[in-house]
A protein has these predicted regions:
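Hydrophobic alpha-helical and helix-loop surface patches within well-folded domains
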Residues: 15, 19-35, 47-48, 275, ...
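Early extracytoplasmic/domain-onset interaction patches
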Residues: 18-85
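Solvent-exposed beta-hairpin/edge-strand motifs
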Residues: 79-121, 175, 213-218, 564-575
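Glycine/proline-rich low-complexity spacer/linker segments in large multi-domain proteins
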Residues: 94-105, 154-208, 228-229, 606-620
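Beta-strand-rich binding/interaction modules
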Residues: 221-222, 538-603
Length: 620
């Protein structure tokens, strides 16, 4: 009706209202989104069922696949065609990518050998296409109807391994290996952004069955539950796998001696490993004939006692990986019980030794490092992506700060529990903050809300990692842990398995906290601000000392002051970002002491200041 729509649109039109893109405004009008942070009463999203069979026969580099897709149109729109992702085409010469490509990276891309639309074979006709391809349907796909599609395809795995590719001649990591329907959502319509090899992804939640055909003596690790372990593993190794799911002790399912004996798997010429999982955003897999296999498990839900399997697949020479299941147990315990404090939602987690430092549902593809502490740091970061984007359905392409920013935040909070706070904060400053704050070029101050596909270079990484993480940590300080946790959990409960946008996050926190935080969101996400505070004056007002601060950079950050008195004693005074709510440029802090002050210094911690020259005020 007209009046509720008018009220809904009018609500944010107050001081410091948040900018609304026109497509978001239309979604509010259509009632698929609501500015109280809830999905609208007419919210919808599309989904599919994917039945995939993929064949890899190393050292042959050709990967062959077949799939049947049932795509379900839950939208109110009639779709005359579908947009498909062919991410493997990023390896084709001439495809637009953000960065150079070595000869070992390049391939011919994906070749579609056969395609059917509702059982009728058709020419695909996109052999020269890139990572995004449109195909008109033989009949329009009506609202709340479905279409059955099938593909047969092949491609050559890249010699250079990154997020996916050949790790060695008998070890492959397969990701983004199948044709999939792109996201069609209630705000942007089709996700029509070509993959450029720098940005990440945006996927629907689908039901998957995955069959992986490999030669005997090859092990396979993949997203989902392994359905036929008795068919692919010899009894001794099956028993070890089953035992690992019931203990917190390390189980060597297959060590280097076992693998050398060539009797770990069933001895058919080709074994078919079957995996399945529903309501998940992607699948990935690793395979090898010489990677050792470790496993254990850990309780991830204290209320039910539910355990999750933790597994590691690696070359036995990778010393850090001998501790990987310990790192995984530690990470899942922290993530489930502390931050975000939501029980790990999947039945397992596998870290596979590769070259990426990349996350996938239930999988991570991580390098090996001589520094074990750094190896744990990387593993926890990738595992924390379980929640953002895989639990929450984030559009990583446009709004990467909604997943990388949270993973970076959880990474810091986790590191503070496994190393000293000073060491954890040093890690964070070194890898997440310094490169941004010490670079005063224009691209570093682009608003975080700027869609990632419109940014390149240094500005993109800092807008996705350090800057938003500092924002999340600042609002945590502003609200306090209990209210922040309530807001975070409420947002996650509202949008789990859906496609939240930044505004859904902002307005969820507003409504759950009972506070209008638009002043905070505006400064951190929509402005060109940065961190630069100054102590402008310290005054004695009738025996009561007051510190005056200027916020030159504009970001509303927490404030810590080191106050040194004339008697040599010191005290640290903390204020939350609330001091910037009424006046974002200036604030005064009453010290609450009548002792004479000698000096006041800003102590920034992780909130590194762009100009330290004005951080100390000496009282004359």
């Amino acid at each position: 009706m007209f009046l509720p729509v008018f009220v809904m649109i009018a609500l944010p039109l107050t001081a410091q209202q948040l900018y609304w893109p026109r497509d978001l405004r239309q979604a509010y009008q259509n009632q698929t989104r609501s500015n109280d942070g809830w999905p609208g009463k007419k919210y919808w999203q599309n989904t599919g069922r994917y039945d995939i069979t993929v064949t890899a026969l190393p050292p042959d580099r050709t990967i062959r696949g077949t799939e049947q897709i049932t795509y379900i149109n839950n939208s109110p729109d009639t779709l005359f065609g579908l947009v498909f992702n062919f991410i493997q085409n990023i390896h084709k010469p001439g495809v637009t990518r953000l960065g150079d490509a070595s000869p070992d990276y390049l391939t011919d891309g994906v070749h579609v050998d056969r395609y059917t639309d509702n059982g009728t074979e058709e020419q695909w006709g996109h052999e020269d296409g890139g990572t995004l391809q449109f195909k008109r349907l033989s009949e329009p796909l009506l609202p709340h109807d479905s279409v059955r599609l099938s593909f047969e395809w092949h491609y050559e795995i890249s010699l250079k391994s990154g997020r996916e590719g050949m790790i060695d001649s008998t070890t492959y990591y397969l990701a983004y290996f199948y044709p999939r329907v792109a996201v069609y959502d209630d705000v942007a319509g089709w996700d029509d952004i070509e993959h450029n090899d720098a940005l990440e992804f945006y996927n629907d939640f689908n039901n998957y069955t995955l069959q992986v055909k490999v030669p005997r003596n090859y092990l396979v690790w993949a997203t989902g539950n392994l359905l036929n372990a008795p068919e692919v593993l010899q009894p001794k190794y099956l028993q070890r796998l089953q035992a690992s799911g019931k203990t917190g002790q390390l189980v060597h399912i297959a060590d280097s001696a076992d693998l050398a004996g060539r009797q770990v798997t069933a001895q058919q010429d080709v074994n078919t490993w079957k995996f399945a999982y529903d309501d998940i955003s992607d699948v990935a897999l690793g395979l090898s004939d010489h990677y050792v296999w470790d496993a254990s498990s850990v309780v991830v839900d204290a209320s039910t006692g539910r355990r999750a399997s933790v597994q590691a697949a690696y070359n036995d020479t990778a010393m850090d990986y001998h501790h990987m299941t310990d790192y995984e147990q530690s990470a899942l315990t922290f993530l489930s019980g502390q931050w975000p404090g939501v029980p790990y939602p999947f039945p397992k987690m596998t870290v596979f030794q590769g070259y990426a430092g990349m996350e996938y549902p239930m999988m991570a593809n991580d390098e090996t490092y001589q520094n074990f502490e750094f190896s744990r740091f990387v593993a926890e970061h990738e595992i924390s992506h379980t929640y953002f984007p895989f639990y929450m359905g984030i559009d990583e392409t446009r709004y990467g700060f909604m997943d990388e920013g949270w993973a970076t935040t959880f990474e810091l909070l986790y590191n503070r529990t496994v190393m000293s706070r000073d060491s954890a904060d040093d890690f964070y400053r070194q890898f997440r903050v310094n490169n941004w704050i010490e670079d005063n070029s224009a691209e570093e101050d682009l608003p975080i809300i700027t869609p990632g596909d419109d940014i390149g270079g240094r500005g993109l990484g800092n807008n996705e990692y350090g800057k938003p993480s500092l924002a999340y940590l600042s609002v945590k300080d502003l609200l306090g842990d209990d209210l922040f946790r309530k807001c975070l959990h409420g947002f996650m409960e509202r949008w789990h398995g859906k496609h939240p946008l930044p505004w859904d996050f902002f307005y969820s926190f507003n409504s759950i906290s009972g506070k209008n935080l638009d002043w905070f969101w505006n400064a951190w996400f929509f402005s060109h601000d940065y961190i630069d505070l100054a102590v402008s004056n310290v005054q004695n007002r009738g025996g009561d000392w007051e510190v005056h601060l200027d916020n030159i950079g504009g970001f509303p950050v927490p404030v810590d002051l080191l106050v040194t008195y004339t008697d040599g004693s010191t005290v640290t005074v903390h204020r939350t970002p609330a001091i910037w709510e009424q006046d974002p440029a200036r604030a005064s802090i009453a010290l609450g002491s009548k002792k004479s002050v000698r000096s006041v210094t800003l102590v920034h911690g992780i909130y590194v200041d762009a100009d330290a020259a004005n951080d100390t005020f000496e009282v004359k």
